[in-house]
Amino acid sequence: MQKLIAIEGIDGSGKTTLANLLKEHLESKMKLNVIVTREPFSEDIIKLIEKIGWNDPILLVLLFAADREIHVNWLSKIKDADLIILDRYYFSSIAYQGALGVDEQWIKMVNSYFPKPDMVILLDLPIEVAISRIKNDKFNFEEKIKSLAKVREKYLKLAKEYNFYVVDASKDKNEVLEQAIKIIQKNLF
């Protein structure tokens, strides 16, 4: 499989924006063939999660792992890409479902069969900034702040454990892109 970069971060951190900007930059400036994908990936699994999964964090771990298996199987068939950028990967399960109280070691074990990314970029920002970016979503404001704070804490712990590259995502999207490009050029190409 080609080089894999996972972009992680709490809701509203700018993962999708960065993934798309990186693709554009790396294809035009470095002449790389870049594929961007995101999780959840499978429409069937997404429908199942929406129907039965959100209230059961253990079921969520398993459904996201099933989705990831479909995703990774699809990725393994791509032969002409130099780089695959993943907008979320298994670290999201560890952070989000771990924040809901699911045993992190079990989540890691469930996801241990998936390819390790060559690099993980964690987009970190204060909860208030993330909330302001996703304010159009329908959610209980107080609950969302509490849950995102727990998830952010999990991500920062994972960053130390797995040597993520942490980028300040509260900055302008072009500054975030510039930081990410420097990290990629220095450490991957």
Swiss-Prot record:
Keywords of the record: ATP-binding, Kinase, Nucleotide biosynthesis, Nucleotide-binding, Transferase
Keyword Glycoprotein: no
E.C. numbers: 2.7.4.9
Any GO BP annotation: dUDP biosynthetic process
Membership in a protein family: Belongs to the thymidylate kinase family.
GO molecular function: ATP binding; dTMP kinase activity
GO CC term, one of those recorded: cytoplasm
PROSITE patterns according to UniProt: THYMIDYLATE_KINASE
Catalytic reaction annotation: dTMP + ATP = dTDP + ADP
Record protein name field: Probable thymidylate kinase 1
Annotated ATP binding sites: G9, I10, D11, G12, S13, G14, K15, T16
Transmembrane parts of this sequence: none
